[in-house]
């Protein structure tokens, strides 16, 4: 490989790294909301998996504890699915055109 080609690859890798950092910083600011029980339980989570808020409708507090626990778990899982989906969409623009191995997920 010629010196110029290597330098070009290094610049390209550095640019990609900077773009990945910007995308990850942007994802940290995105908040998604998972819910269950028709919106009776809601979980707000950043795309860095930080839970920001859990809201439980007061009508559930007098109900069955097991049901409430199931609804909270379902809301968390819904939020996680939304985080993964949003992250994949946002990172797709950064990784577009990069020759990544099949099944490789970013960020790592």
Swiss-Prot record:
Q: Which Pfam families match?
A: YbaB_DNA_bd
Q: Which InterPro entries match?
A: YbaB-like_sf, YbaB/EbfC
- Main localization is cytoplasm
Which one of the record's GO molecular function terms can you name?
A: DNA binding
Q: Which domain of life is it from?
A: Bacteria
Quote the cellular component terms of the Gene Ontology held in the record. bacterial nucleoid; cytosol
Q: Mind listing the UniProt keywords for this protein, alphabetically? A: Cytoplasm, DNA-binding
| Cell compartments where the protein resides | Cytoplasm, Nucleoid
Q: Which Gene3D superfamilies match?
A: Nucleoid-associated protein YbaB-like domain (3.30.1310.10)
Recorded hits in HAMAP family, A to Z, give: DNA_YbaB_EbfC
Q: What does this protein do?
A: Binds to DNA and alters its conformation. May be involved in regulation of gene expression, nucleoid organization and DNA protection.
Q: Please give the family membership noted in the entry.
A: Belongs to the YbaB/EbfC family.
Q: What does the subunit comment say?
A: Homodimer.
Q: What is this protein called?
A: Nucleoid-associated protein Bpet3552
Organism, scientific name: Bordetella petrii (strain ATCC BAA-461 / DSM 12804 / CCUG 43448)
Give the lineage: Bacteria, Pseudomonadati, Pseudomonadota, Betaproteobacteria, Burkholderiales
